């Protein structure tokens, strides 16, 4: 073995001493989690409001007040001098929703009975835009007039179909187990020429069913949507409402605002009827039942889709869908301010079958 000669004492060498370079740790970009199903890998994406969402940025209160003058008495300035409303006040929230629908979606009549769910328009609109993205990904030349959607639990507010019709021209069927919700949603449709002929409201007569009894034998749907009941009981729902109010009160006091109303005065914006808020077993049981029923309509529905409020329910839903034979599963996380929501979409048809679906012009 040849050993390199060491220089004698005092002898110069051509070697330069090694400089002590600072150790720089290479930053690794955290990749979004992926889920592989039948050869398809799908990333869980987190983002803010969708680029096509009309509600990015601050609310234009002068314009909103112009279309709904009653809103003016509910508008105030926050400590930063920005116009806002008291989001714990049910009347304020209802009037804001009405103004947003009139200004941005051309709705001429919209109302809900007292005590029914009054969802935030920006978040619901975001959901519809991301549904559109899913469809466009599979068919970039999508003719939106061919899209037929089914909203499970349309509610008295009819928000998903309203946004879907006015933004994309989709046709809808909205189902609900509550006759009052169906009656009010139907009134909204009948009172708006933009919605007439595009939305049909159907009563689900069996509360144990989701798709059964709604999807006809010869019907085909491009996509289904749902905002499932979150709680497992009325007591859980009431506790959840009180918790939201308590958090909102603390946040408003921190910002120097007046205390907000108590639970008895704030049912509307955080409230809702039984079917809107809770069911036996809560969200996990509901979406589990939805997964099982969806398999029965695997060839009649291109994409099934539902919101999931509890992140812990996502993994179980994925595993169940895999066992049921879902060919593709998408999980998308949406960040809207401090709130993180997510939805899961699945199809029992592979990529080639989905192409054939569009060629058949559902």
UniProtKB/Swiss-Prot annotation:
Residues 1-40 are annotated as: Disordered. Signal peptide: none annotated. The keyword Transferase applies. This is Ribosomal RNA large subunit methyltransferase F. The gene is rlmF. Keywords: Cytoplasm, Methyltransferase, rRNA processing, S-adenosyl-L-methionine, Transferase. It is found in: Cytoplasm. Pfam families: Methyltransf_10. Specifically methylates the adenine in position 1618 of 23S rRNA. One of its GO terms (cellular component) is cytoplasm. It comes from Vibrio cholerae serotype O1 (strain ATCC 39315 / El Tor Inaba N16961).
């Amino acid at each position: 073995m040849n050993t390199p000669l060491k220089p004698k004492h005092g002898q110069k060498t051509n070697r330069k001493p090694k400089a002590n370079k600072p150790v720089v740790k290479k930053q690794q970009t955290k990749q979004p989690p992926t889920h592989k199903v039948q050869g398809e890998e799908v990333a869980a994406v987190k983002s803010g409001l969708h680029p096509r969402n009309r509600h990015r940025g601050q609310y234009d209160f002068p314009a909103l007040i112009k279309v709904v003058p009653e809103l003016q008495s509910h508008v105030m300035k926050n400590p930063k001098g920005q116009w806002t409303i008291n989001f714990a006040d049910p009347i304020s929230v209802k009037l804001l929703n009405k103004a947003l629908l009139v200004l941005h979606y051309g709705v001429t009549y919209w109302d809900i009975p007292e005590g029914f769910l009054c969802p935030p328009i920006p978040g619901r609109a975001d959901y519809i835009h991301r549904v559109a993205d899913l469809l466009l990904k599979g068919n970039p030349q999508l003719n939106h007039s061919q899209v037929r959607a089914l909203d499970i639990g349309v509610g008295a507010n009819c928000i998903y179909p309203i946004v879907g019709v006015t933004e994309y021209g989709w046709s809808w069927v909205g189902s609900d187990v509550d006759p009052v919700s169906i009656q009010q949603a139907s009134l909204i449709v009948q009172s708006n020429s933009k919605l007439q002929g595009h939305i049909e409201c159907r009563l689900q007569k069996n509360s144990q069913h989701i798709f059964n009894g709604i999807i006809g034998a010869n019907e085909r749907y491009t996509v289904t949507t749902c905002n499932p009941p979150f709680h497992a009981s009325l007591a859980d729902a009431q506790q959840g409402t009180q918790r939201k109010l308590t958090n909102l009160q603390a946040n408003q006091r921190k910002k120097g605002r007046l205390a907000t109303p108590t639970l008895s005065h704030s049912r509307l914006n955080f409230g809702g009827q039984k079917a809107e808020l809770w069911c036996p077993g809560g969200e996990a049981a509901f979406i589990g039942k939805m997964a099982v029923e969806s398999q029965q309509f695997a060839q009649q529905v291109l994409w099934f889709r539902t919101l999931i409020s509890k992140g812990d329910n996502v993994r179980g839903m994925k595993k169940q869908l895999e066992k049921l034979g879902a060919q593709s599963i998408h999980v998308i996380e949406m960040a809207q301010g401090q709130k993180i929501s997510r939805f899961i979409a699945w199809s029992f048809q592979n990529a080639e079958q989905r192409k054939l679906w569009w060629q058949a012009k559902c």
